[in-house]
Design a protein with these regions (language model features):
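A conserved beta-strand->alpha-helix junction
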Residues: 1-23, 49, 172, 179
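Short, polar/flexible loop-turn hinges at active-site or ligand-entry regions and domain interfaces
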Residues: 4, 25-29, 73-78, 243-247
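Short catalytic/ligand-binding loop motif for oxyanion handling, primarily in non-cytosolic enzymes
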Residues: 12-16, 58-62, 276
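Conserved donor sugar-nucleotide recognition element shared by glycan-biosynthetic enzymes
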Residues: 13, 32, 36
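Short low-complexity, flexible loop/linker segments enriched in glycine and/or proline
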Residues: 18-22, 44, 66-68, 282-284
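Adenosyl-5′-phosphate
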Residues: 32, 45, 49-51, 98, ...
Length: 327
């Protein structure tokens, strides 16, 4: 094929990081903003307008986690809710429940719906690896999700109910719960696959994917256009029955069938890969580890007043000493 290759080094990634705050003007935790910026910069050397394929996974069910959630929830809902919750609660009391596989299985049993399973973690790649390590299961439970989103903020960790500076005496946990309460439950009253697709189209896609591409591309004066989000394409995608979208572990079936007309199957039928960087490995290597630890200095964190220095220290220690990753 006629294409260009860009190899990103740890040093290049570190050089980009100081520029990110000026691009986004707010905290933005998707690490793929780094390669997206570098690809945009390379693209801008050749063109001023580029097409983006964003929206294809959400509209045509391409994410691997869609298939996993369907299978997981299919198994869960066949078991009595009372029995599942009792078992999940008992697992949480075990002294070794902090081990990743055991903890994930315990939280999974507490889930009430497919969305609780799905909302546990937005980091698709991290979640994929975690699922694979615990026999095809994923953590669940809205409380577990909310706790994970609020962990590290003052008062956000644990069950102490401590208050912080989010305003109105609210904890970080309260803020996340309030956010999800804005959506009427009946909005997601549809099949498991359609429910998680809809959530992504309402939240993840506009608040993460589109923001990331827009900010990084415009930082280098590159205009991006998103043909998948054409009104007619969106309406067509939502009109398709699920068997046209996914079959077992294969998604985007309609798009694949179209592309097969132009690209040999052997070039297409391969495992899906996210647009990510080896952030975990990099953070354990000397240069970026030293940089990260300078930012996580307890005295610095306390002087800033945003994070709980002790909680941040525990999270970093879990990562560096035990390999526990909490994006």
């Amino acid at each position: 094929t006629d294409h260009m290759r860009l190899t990103i080094t740890e040093k290049e990634a570190k050089e980009v990081i100081p520029r990110l705050s000026s691009m986004f003007a707010e905290p933005f935790g998707d690490s793929s903003q780094i390669p997206t910026y570098l690809v945009s910069r390379m693209t801008r050397e050749h063109v001023t307008v580029a097409l983006s394929g964003d929206g294809g996974d959400e509209l045509f069910a391409g994410y691997n986690i869609y298939g996993w959630c369907e299978r997981i929830w299919g198994k869960l809902r066949s078991r009595p809710a009372a029995l599942r919750k009792a078992a999940g609660g008992l697992i949480g009391l075990l002294p070794f429940s902090g081990r990743e596989g055991i903890g994930l299985k315990g939280k999974l049993l507490l889930s009430d719906s497919i969305l609780e399973v799905y909302r546990t973690n937005y980091e698709r790649e991290a979640l994929a690896e975690r699922i694979a390590r615990v026999d095809g299961r994923v953590s669940g439970g809205q409380d577990a999700f909310i706790g994970g989103r609020s962990e590290g903020f003052p008062g956000g960790q644990g069950a102490s109910g401590g208050r912080n500076s989010f305003g109105g005496g609210r904890t970080a946990r309260d803020c996340v719960r309030e956010f999800y309460s804005r959506f009427p439950a009946e909005l997601f009253d549809r099949t498991p696959l359609k429910a998680v697709q809809l959530q992504d189209m309402l939240l993840y896609h506009p608040d993460d994917i589109l923001v990331k591409v827009d900010r990084t591309a415009m930082a280098v004066s590159l205009e991006t256009r998103v043909p998948m989000l054409d009104k007619d394409v969106v309406e067509f995608a939502w009109s398709l029955p699920e068997e046209y979208l996914r079959q077992q572990d294969t998604g985007k079936l309609v798009l694949r069938d179209v592309l097969y007309r132009y690209v040999p199957k052997e070039m297409m039928d391969r495992p899906k890969k996210g647009f990510s960087i080896p952030i975990r490995r990099w953070l354990l290597e000397p240069e970026l580890r030293a940089w990260a630890e300078s930012l996580l200095d307890p005295a610095l964190i306390r002087s800033q007043g945003f994070l709980d220095a002790d909680a941040a220290g525990r999270i970093w220690k879990d990562f560096t000493e035990q390999g526990i990753w909490r994006p």
